[in-house]
């Protein structure tokens, strides 16, 4: 199953982006490989983010998503293959419990991609960050790696299934150690 997830993340993302006419301009790609496992933090703009992350991170990672996506016909099967952790955002206590397997996955060597805002931002401005991603990184003793994406929301609007051709600018920033936090 992990091999299938790795192939789907890398080749599937590459093919999907190419077929849609989306090109990535990546700065700092070496930072995606500098320290693994890691908690990759990205600004969430649209469903296109999933494909961009797959093309950048390529293998041995999973994600965290809202519970409502577990049975989504487009995202659900991908999430199942990738062992995505689904979080009930309406119940903080349950959400914390649901994050424990994510910490275990980090300790076992698998990276996590998560939007620290907890939702899509309707504009290019960042929303306030949730604490969960940082707690997971600290508990697992792994670094956080910020990934900044630009143009995803313009190329594929929120709640849309239409992808327009274009260029997504991606900056993978250096890993930030959580030791001593």
Q: Model-predicted segments: where are they?
A:
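Residue-level preference for the first positions of well-ordered beta-strands
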Residues: 37-39, 111-115
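Catalytic core of membrane glycerolipid acyltransferases/transacylases, capturing the structured
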Residues: 1-6, 10, 17-20, 34-92
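Thr-Gly-centered strand-to-loop micro-motif
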Residues: 27, 64-66, 88-89, 116, ...
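A cross-family acyltransferase "interaction/gating" segment
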Residues: 74-77, 98, 107-113, 122-181
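Short glycine-rich anion-binding loops that position phosphate/pyrophosphate groups of nucleotides
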Residues: 44-47, 117-121
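Generic preference for hydrophobic
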Residues: 26, 40, 63, 170-172
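A short beta-turn/loop motif at secondary-structure boundaries
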Residues: 29-34, 162-163
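Anionic-ligand binding region
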Residues: 94-103
């Amino acid at each position: 199953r992990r091999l299938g997830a790795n192939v789907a993340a890398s080749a599937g993302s590459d093919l999907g982006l190419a077929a849609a006419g989306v090109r990535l301009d990546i700065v700092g790609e070496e930072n995606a490989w500098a320290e693994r496992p890691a908690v990759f933090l990205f600004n969430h703009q649209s469903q296109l983010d999933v494909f961009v992350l797959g093309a950048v991170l390529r293998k041995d990672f999973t994600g965290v998503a809202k519970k409502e996506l577990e049975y989504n016909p487009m995202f659900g099967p991908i999430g199942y293959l990738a062992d995505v952790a689904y979080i009930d955002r309406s119940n903080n206590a349950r959400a914390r419990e649901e994050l424990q397997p994510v910490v275990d996955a980090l300790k076992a060597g698998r990276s996590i991609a998560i939007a620290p805002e907890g939702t899509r931002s309707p504009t290019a401005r960042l929303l306030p960050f949730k604490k969960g991603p940082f707690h997971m990184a600290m508990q697992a003793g792994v670094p956080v790696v910020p990934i900044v994406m630009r143009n995803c929301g313009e190329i594929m609007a929120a709640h849309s299934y239409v992808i327009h051709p274009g260029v997504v600018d991606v900056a993978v920033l250096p890993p930030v150690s959580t030791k001593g936090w």
